[in-house]
Amino acid sequence: MTRKGLWVINIVVLVSLLGCMAMIYSLSAKPANFMLSCSSELFNHEVGVADSDHYLLVDLVSKDGLAQINYRYYDLQGNSAGTISMAGKVNKVDTQRQMFDIAVTTKQENVGLKGQEKPEHYEYLSYISGIHLNKNGQHSLSVQVLERDDTKDYAIVLFQPSNTVCGC
């Protein structure tokens, strides 16, 4: 065999090995798993007092690239004012900016007690996610860690597009 033929064979084998290594890495690389339990008092400057009678608990769980987000609304007496549960997948994790991009594909809503006023935040989140799900089949949601204290296991997190800041 000629020298050129050996070089061609070596290059083909090397490229094949590199391709196999890349394939193994992509199949074995696991997405980040995380869990956040967050809370926030609701306040809307435009509405004033009407929305300050509620608080919000947000639970976010991500495992193996799938995500579940539960928004639970309560009045100050602890009565449920409604829940919005969303499920989807984690599209991207930006570790430098501490940001998670989630594509929500399903949503379920439960209204609180009969006759109880729903928080403005509930109404907005229900409306905007409904539009996106009906139009595109998915609702994009981002979660960004604004501040973090690992010693106290605490973080301040921003949820978009609902523009909600929570302590987690």
Where are these regions (language model features)?
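Generic short beta-strand segments
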Residues: 39-45, 70-74, 103-109
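Hydrophobic membrane-insertion alpha-helices, especially the h-region
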Residues: 3-26
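Extracytoplasmic/periplasmic/luminal assembly and interaction segments
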Residues: 48-99
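Non-cytosolic head/periplasmic domains of membrane-anchored proteins
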Residues: 94-168
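Mature extracytoplasmic/luminal segments of secretory-pathway proteins
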Residues: 17, 35, 163-165
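Short, hydrophobic/aromatic-rich segments at coil-to-beta transitions
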Residues: 31-39, 64-69, 151-157
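Tryptophan-anchored aromatic micro-motifs
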Residues: 31-53
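Charged, amphipathic alpha-helical segments
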Residues: 20-23, 52, 139
